[in-house]
Amino acid sequence: MSATPLVSQVDSHNPEKSKLIPPLLGASVAELSAWVQQQGQPAYRGKQLHEWIYDKGVRSLADISVFSKQWRAEVAEIPIGRSTLHYRSVAPDGTVKYLLRLTDGQIIETVGIPTFAERGEGPKARLTVCVSTQVGCPMACDFCATGKGGYKRNLARHEIIDQVLTVQEDFQQRVSNVVFMGLGEPLLNTENVLAALKSLNQDIGIGQRSLTVSTVGIRDRIRQFAQNNLQITLAVSLHAPNQALREKLIPSARAYPLEELLAECREYVEITGRRVTFEYVLLAGVNDLPEHALELSKCMRGFQSHVNLIPYNPIQEVDYKRPNRDRIEAFVNVLKQQNTAVSVRYSRGLEADAACGQLRASKN
């Protein structure tokens, strides 16, 4: 009996009407149960298969010992959807950068970010994974390394989920948080990002509020994303408090005026009840002046929002610099005086080129 491809979308009342496509990673218990039944196996095998994929990290169906040798041989060629490790580097702060090779030979980057106990000793209190959603990035933000290598393609659902399992297996600790802040623009790959979010929540057990999707802002996509009524965190890469400066830093902003972006963010808050986080990379002498902070505070008025300031992480291709601490504190103080919720994030993984804005899917 030859194996049928994976059930990717299942009508639980009529499994035979389901669309069948491989690979298996990203499939739910219901999907896997429907698939094994199509192979002549009992439904409970689907739950076993789910456990082996997500909990045991199996990479080939041929290695699942609870199944008969005959059936394993029949389905051995059906892919689970795991990548191979191309490169791994560790920063002094414990952050790990991974380059993963996909089945078509493309390379993507993933980062594992452990948070330790207060003194930096003992078990890791939290493990965050920064995942990529595209091979490369088409947005070409002026200060970011990710877009310098160009854009190749979207990642499939399984290629996003695989990054989380890779980090989880390497650290031998369950992942607590996932941030979609790696290579690519998530809202240009909405279908696969939504499917990955669902699987990370339901199959791997990561709470929705521990999932963050970052976007530079794509016209109408934030509104569409809100319709899914997820309880994830939306992070918008703003980086400038006015349209003119934003266009210089983010070329795609020319097609999406700041006022329209902010209007969509307000709609997102109204629909989901969740505040929006605005990421703002501080560039010395470019967007870090007190008047910029005052403009930024005005953008935040009228809806639930939080500003996350990120002091710039240098890359070789451009001459931007990180502001000194006095300049950063002055910027923060202006925002606080305007009652704008604000925090400063000093990025982890700087020495491994794994910090915010440094990801490029290369060893250097």
Swiss-Prot record:
Highest taxon, organism lineage: Bacteria
Location within or outside the cell: Cytoplasm
GO terms of molecular function: 4 iron, 4 sulfur cluster binding; metal ion binding; rRNA (adenine(2503)-C2-)-methyltransferase activity; rRNA binding; tRNA (adenine(37)-C2)-methyltransferase activity; tRNA binding
Amino acids binding [4Fe-4S] cluster: 137, 141, 144
Names of required cofactors: [4Fe-4S] cluster
Enzyme class: transferase
Residues that hold S-adenosyl-L-methionine according to the record: 184-185, 214, 237-239, 313
Gene Ontology cellular component terms for the protein in this record: cytoplasm
Record's keyword terms, sorted: 4Fe-4S, Cytoplasm, Disulfide bond, Iron, Iron-sulfur, Metal-binding, Methyltransferase, rRNA processing, S-adenosyl-L-methionine, Transferase, tRNA processing
Cofactor: record remark: Binds 1 [4Fe-4S] cluster. The cluster is coordinated with 3 cysteines and an exchangeable S-adenosyl-L-methionine.
Domain Radical SAM core: 123-351
EC number: 2.1.1.192
Signal peptide: none
Something else known: Reaction proceeds by a ping-pong mechanism involving intermediate methylation of a conserved cysteine residue.
Role description: Specifically methylates position 2 of adenine 2503 in 23S rRNA and position 2 of adenine 37 in tRNAs.
Protein name: Probable dual-specificity RNA methyltransferase RlmN
Lineage: Bacteria, Bacillati, Cyanobacteriota, Cyanophyceae, Nostocales
Gene assigned in the entry: rlmN
